[in-house]
C-alpha cells in the first residue's frame, strides 16, 4: 500500500487541500529544523495570517529531530522507532471542524483504509476532556480509553498562545512479543504503540498562564509514516520495514555483513543518517562548524563511526546516500536532480573526517583502559577528541554507551572555556508574532507600487515604536516605523537590502527612510523624523537614487548564477546572497575553490551578457509553468501558486520578486573581487558593477600609477621581481630569535610559529647549527597554515611527523626521513597542531 498517497487522497475526499512538504529549514527563528507537520501552518494557527479559503489541509511533511528542543539523535539505532528524519502525515482544520469530525476521520482511516482491527486499538484522552471521552465511546469500549494528565495529553506551542488537550490512538502489538514490566497500556514499554496524535486546539494561554476558549477551535494531527509502514508489514521495528530494505542491502554489500548480525544497531544508524544527510544536502544545508551545518556534520560523523565498527575504513556513506536519492526520486524529484552534488559533498566530508577518525579511535580506546570505577570518561580527553580529532561530544558519549560510561562534563566544559558553541545557530527569523497580532487585525496589506515608480502620493496609516506599539504622532529625531497606504519602497528580500529614501510633507523633507522590511505581508519603512508627523498625514514617498545601483547589482546576481551554472555545472544553486548599492555577495553550492581560469570565464560570461543590452521581462504565471520553463528557484523559499518570473532573454530566468534594470547594458560592467569558502560545499563570490565598478577601476589605475613611481620602473612585473629578490636576500640573514629551543636528552627541539621568512631555509639553517635536532616551524599565509620540519640524528621520520600534524590542520604532508613540508586550511587548529607537534617530539625522545 502507498500509505502516503492513501492518506492524502482520503483527506482530499473529505474536503482538504493537499499541501506539499515544506523545506526542512523553516522560516522560523524558534526552530532549528521543521519538526512537525503543523510548522508550515503556524502563522495560521496563531492568527498572524488569515485562514485560507479552504479551511482544511493535509500534508505528508518531512521532519528532522536532531538538535534543538526535539532531538532523537542519541536514540537512533537503539530503539525501534526513533529517527532523525521521518515523514509526518497530518490533517488540519483552521476553525472549521473540531473533535467529532477529527475523531471520526481518524477512526475511519485507521480501521477501513489501513485495516487495523478495532479490537487491537486503544485510546488516550486528557483527564479533563470528557467530550473526547464520550465521542470515543461510540467506537471503542470504555475500558480501552485511558485518561492521562498534562504531561502526556496536553499540547501547547509555547509558554503562551494556542494550546489544548490531545487524544492518541494506540495499537496493541501483541502480548507474545512484549512481556516486560512496562508492557501495559499507559506503561513505558513498546507493546502499546502510539500511531496517531490528535490535538484539539481550543484554548489560548495568556502570559500569566490563564486559559481562555478560542473563538474558532482548530485541529492539528500527526502520524509517523515509517511507524505505520512497519505495523502494516507486521514488523516490530521501523527499520525492518520495506522502506529501509534498499538501504540495508547497500550497507550489507559494503560491509559483507548480514543485517541480522550483532551489528544491527550500526546498520540502522547508517540507514537513518544516510536519509537525513541526503535530504539536508539536497535542500541546501551544508557541512559547517555551527548551526544546522554542524548538526549535519554530527549526523555524518556518527554514521562514520558506526561504519568503522563494521570494518569500513574508507568513505562509504556517500554510496548509501546515493541509494536514498534514487529511492525517493518519484516523490522528491530534487533528490535525483542533485544526486551527483549530494554524493560528492558527502564524499568530501567523509574524507576529511576519516583522516582523523582512526587516530581519534586509538586515543579513545587507550583512554578506555583508564576508566575509573564510576565509569567516568576523562573530560579532558573528550575535549581533545572534540577539538583535535573532530569528535562531537554526543559521538563520544555514543561510543561510551556500550561500556556503561559517560563523559565528565565538568571537565569537558572547563576545557571548552571560550570556544564557540558550535551547536548554536546563526539564522535570521521573524519578529515576535505577538508584536503584530493587533496590527494585522487593524490593517490590510498595503499596496506596493515600486515596480512602476520610485515616487508616489500616500497616506501614513500608522506609526509604531521599536516594539511595534502604535503611536498617534511623532517628534523630530525619533526613529519610528511607518505603514503607508501605498509604498514605492521595496522591502528587504531575495538578498536585496530594503529601499531608503524620504517622506515629504508640504514640499518639505519630513523624514528620512532608513530601511524597509516586510512583516507578515505588511511593508514597514523605518523613519528618522525631521518634522513632526501624525497618523493620517498625506505625504510624498520618494525612493533614493541608490535604488538604480541596487537594481544593477541584483540583475548582475542573476547573470552571475547563470554563468556559474554554465561554467561549473547545473549542480550550482543559490545558498544565500546580499545585494547592495555598492557590491553583491553570492553564495552557491560547489565542492571546491574556483581556479583563475574558471573565475575569468564566469566574469567574461557576465560581461558578455551586459554588453548585449538584453532587455528584462517580467511575467506572472503558475509555479509549475515557471519550473517547466526552467526558472531557477530557491529551495528554502515558500512560493505562492502564482509567481513572478524575471528573465533576460536566453541568459537568465528566475523566480524573483525584486527590482531589476530594464536592460543589462545599464549594469555597465562586472568585476569579481573575491572567491572564498563559506562552509563545506558552499563557495562565495563578491563582486561589483555599475558606479562601484567604475570607481574600482579608477582607484586601481591610481594605485598602478603610484606603484610605478615607487618602484621607479614602468614595468611593474620587473620592478616587483627585483623587490622580492631583495627581500628574500634580507630574510636569509638569521633564524628569528623568538623561536623556542629546548634541549632534551642532548637533542635540540624547536617547535614554533614565525610571521615571515622562508621556513624551509630556516629548517636548513637549524640543521646546520645543531648536531641532533627535531624542528617544526609553522607560518600562516593568507587562509592557510604552512609547516616545515627537519630531523637530524633523532628517532622519528620527518614525513611521518609532518603528515600527522598536517591532518589536524585539515591537510596532508610529504617529504623525506630528514625533511618534510605540509599545510592545511584549518587555521583555528594551529594551537592544537603546535601542541601535537611538541608532544610527538617529546614522546620520541623519551623512548
UniProtKB/Swiss-Prot annotation:
Main subcellular location of this protein, as a coarse class: cytoplasm
Subcellular location: Cytoplasm
Cofactor note: Binds 1 zinc ion per subunit.
Catalysed reaction equations from the record: tRNA(Ala) + L-alanine + ATP = L-alanyl-tRNA(Ala) + AMP + diphosphate
Binding-site residues for Zn(2+), renumbered to this chain: 554, 558, 656, 660
EC number: 6.1.1.7
Principal EC category: ligase
Keywords: Aminoacyl-tRNA synthetase, ATP-binding, Cytoplasm, Ligase, Metal-binding, Nucleotide-binding, Protein biosynthesis, RNA-binding, tRNA-binding, Zinc
A single BP term in Gene Ontology: alanyl-tRNA aminoacylation
MF terms (GO), sorted A to Z: alanine-tRNA ligase activity; aminoacyl-tRNA deacylase activity; ATP binding; tRNA binding; zinc ion binding
Xref: Gene3D superfamilies: 2.40.30.130, 3.10.310.40, 3.30.54.20, Bira Bifunctional Protein, Domain 2 (3.30.930.10), Threonyl-trna Synthetase, Chain A, domain 2 (3.30.980.10)
Entry note about domains: Consists of three domains; the N-terminal catalytic domain, the editing domain and the C-terminal C-Ala domain. The editing domain removes incorrectly charged amino acids, while the C-Ala domain, along with tRNA(Ala), serves as a bridge to cooperatively bring together the editing and aminoacylation centers thus stimulating deacylation of misacylated tRNAs.
Protein known as: Alanine--tRNA ligase
Primary gene name: alaS
Amino acid at each position: 500500500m502507498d500509505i502516503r498517497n492513501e492518506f492524502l487522497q482520503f483527506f482530499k475526499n473529505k474536503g482538504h487541500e493537499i499541501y506539499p512538504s515544506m523545506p526542512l529549514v523553516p522560516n522560523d527563528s524558534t526552530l532549528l529544523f521543521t519538526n512537525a507537520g503543523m510548522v508550515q501552518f503556524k502563522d495560521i494557527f496563531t492568527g498572524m495570517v488569515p485562514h485560507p479559503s479552504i479551511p482544511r489541509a493535509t500534508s505528508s511533511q518531512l521532519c528532522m529531530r536532531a538538535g534543538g528542543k526535539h532531538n532523537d539523535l542519541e536514540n537512533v539505532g537503539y530503539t525501534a522507532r526513533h529517527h532523525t528524519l521521518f515523514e509526518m502525515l497530518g490533517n488540519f482544520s483552521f476553525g472549521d471542524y473540531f473533535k467529532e469530525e477529527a475523531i471520526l476521520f481518524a477512526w475511519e482511516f485507521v480501521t477501513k483504509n489501513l485495516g487495523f482491527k478495532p479490537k487491537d486499538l486503544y485510546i488516550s484522552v486528557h483527564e479533563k476532556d470528557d467530550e473526547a471521552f464520550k465521542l470515543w465511546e461510540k467506537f471503542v469500549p470504555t475500558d480501552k480509553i485511558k485518561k492521562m494528565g498534562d504531561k502526556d495529553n496536553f499540547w501547547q506551542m509555547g509558554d503562551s498562545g494556542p494550546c489544548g488537550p490531545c487524544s492518541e490512538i494506540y495499537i496493541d502489538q501483541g502480548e507474545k512479543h512484549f512481556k516486560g514490566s512496562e508492557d501495559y497500556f499507559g506503561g513505558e514499554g513498546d507493546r502499546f504503540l502510539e500511531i496517531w496524535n490528535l490535538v484539539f486546539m481550543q484554548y489560548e494561554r495568556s502570559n500569566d498562564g490563564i486559559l481562555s476558549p478560542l473563538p474558532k477551535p482548530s485541529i492539528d494531527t500527526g502520524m509517523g509514516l515509517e511507524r505505520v509502514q512497519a505495523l502494516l508489514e507486521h514488523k516490530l521495528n521501523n527499520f525492518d520495514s520495506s522502506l529501509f530494505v534498499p538501504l540495508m542491502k547497500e550497507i550489507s554489500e559494503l560491509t559483507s555483513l548480514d543485517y541480522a548480525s550483532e551489528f544491527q544497531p550500526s546498520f540502522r544508524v547508517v540507514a537513518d543518517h544516510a536519509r537525513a544527510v541526503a535530504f539536508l544536502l539536497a535542500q541546501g544545508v551544508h557541512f559547517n562548524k555551527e548551526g544546522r551545518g554542524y548538526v549535519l556534520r554530527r549526523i555524518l560523523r556518527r554514521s562514520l563511526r558506526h561504519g568503522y565498527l563494521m570494518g569500513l575504513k574508507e568513505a562509504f556513506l556517500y554510496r548509501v546516500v546515493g541509494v536514498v536519492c534514487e529511492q525517493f526520486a518519484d516523490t522528491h524529484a530534487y533528490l535525483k536532480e542533485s544526486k551527483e552534488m549530494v554524493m560528492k559533498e558527502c564524499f568530501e566530508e567523509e574524507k576529511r573526517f576519516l583522516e582523523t577518525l582512526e587516530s581519534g579511535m586509538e586515543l579513545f580506546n587507550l583512554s578506555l583502559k583508564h576508566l575509573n570505577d564510576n565509569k567516568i570518561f576523562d573530560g579532558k580527553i573528550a575535549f581533545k577528541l572534540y577539538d583535535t580529532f573532530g569528535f562531537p561530544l554526543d559521538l563520544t558519549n555514543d561510543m561510551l554507551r556500550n561500556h556503561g560510561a559517560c563523559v565528565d562534563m565538568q571537565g569537558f566544559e572547563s576545557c571548552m572555556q571560550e570556544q564557540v558553541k558550535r551547536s548554536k545557530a546563526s539564522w535570521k527569523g521573524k519578529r515576535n508574532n505577538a508584536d503584530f497580532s493587533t496590527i494585522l487585525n487593524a490593517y490590510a496589506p498595503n499596496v506596493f507600487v515600486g515596480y512602476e515608480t520610485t515616487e508616489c502620493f500616500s497616506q501614513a496609516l500608522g506609526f509604531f515604536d521599536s516594539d511595534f506599539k502604535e503611536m498617534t504622532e511623532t517628534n523630530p529625531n525619533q526613529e519610528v516605523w511607518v505603514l503607508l497606504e501605498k509604498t514605492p519602497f521595496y522591502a528587504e528580500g531575495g538578498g536585496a537590502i530594503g529601499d531608503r529614501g524620504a517622506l515629504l510633507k508640504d514640499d518639505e523633507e519630513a523624514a528620512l527612510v532608513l530601511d524597509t522590511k516586510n512583516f507578515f505581508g505588511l511593508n514597514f519603512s523605518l523613519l528618522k523624523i525631521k518634522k513632526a508627523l501624525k497618523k493620517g498625514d498625506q505625504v510624498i514617498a520618494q525612493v533614493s537614487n541608490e535604488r538604480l545601483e541596487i537594481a544593477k547589482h541584483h540583475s548582475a546576481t542573476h547573470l552571475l548564477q547563470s554563468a556559474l551554472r554554465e561554467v561549473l555545472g547545473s549542480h550550482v544553486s543559490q545558498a544565500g546572497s546580499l545585494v547592495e548599492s555598492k557590491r553583491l555577495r553570492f553564495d552557491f553550492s560547489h565542492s571546491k575553490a574556483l581556479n583563475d581560469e574558471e573565475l575569468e570565464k564566469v566574469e567574461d560570461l557576465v560581461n558578455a551578457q551586459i554588453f548585449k543590452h538584453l532587455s528584462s521581462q517580467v511575467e506572472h504565471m503558475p509555479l509549475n509553468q515557471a519550473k517547466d520553463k526552467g526558472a531557477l528557484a530557491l529551495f528554502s523559499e515558500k512560493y505562492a501558486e502564482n509567481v513572478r518570473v524575471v528573465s533576460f532573454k536566453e541568459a537568465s530566468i528566475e523566480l524573483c520578486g525584486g527590482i531589476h534594470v530594464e536592460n543589462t547594458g545599464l549594469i555597465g560592467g562586472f568585476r569579481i573581487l573575491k572567491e572564498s569558502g563559506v562552509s563545506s560545499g558552499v563557495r562565495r563570490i563578491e563582486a561589483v558593477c555599475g558606479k562601484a565598478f567604475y570607481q574600482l577601476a579608477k582607484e586601481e589605475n591610481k594605485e598602478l600609477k603610484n606603484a610605478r613611481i615607487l618602484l621607479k620602473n614602468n614595468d611593474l612585473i620587473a620592478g616587483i621581481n627585483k623587490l622580492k629578490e631583495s627581500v628574500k636576500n634580507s630574510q636569509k640573514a638569521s633564524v628569528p630569535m623568538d623561536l623556542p629551543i629546548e634541549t632534551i636528552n642532548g637533542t635540540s627541539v624547536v617547535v614554533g610559529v614565525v610571521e615571515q621568512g622562508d621556513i624551509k631555509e630556516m629548517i636548513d639553517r637549524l640543521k646546520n647549527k645543531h648536531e641532533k635536532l627535531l624542528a617544526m616551524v609553522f607560518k600562516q599565509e593568507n587562509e592557510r597554515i604552512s609547516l616545515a620540519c627537519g630531523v637530524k640524528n633523532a628517532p622519528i621520520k620527518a614525513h611521518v611527523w609532518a603528515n600527522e600534524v598536517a591532518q589536524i590542520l585539515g591537510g596532508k604532508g610529504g617529504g623525506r626521513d630528514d625533511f618534510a613540508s605540509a599545510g592545511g586550511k584549518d587555521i583555528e587548529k594551529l594551537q592544537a597542531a603546535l601542541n601535537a607537534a611538541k608532544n610527538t617530539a617529546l614522546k620520541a625522545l623519551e623512548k
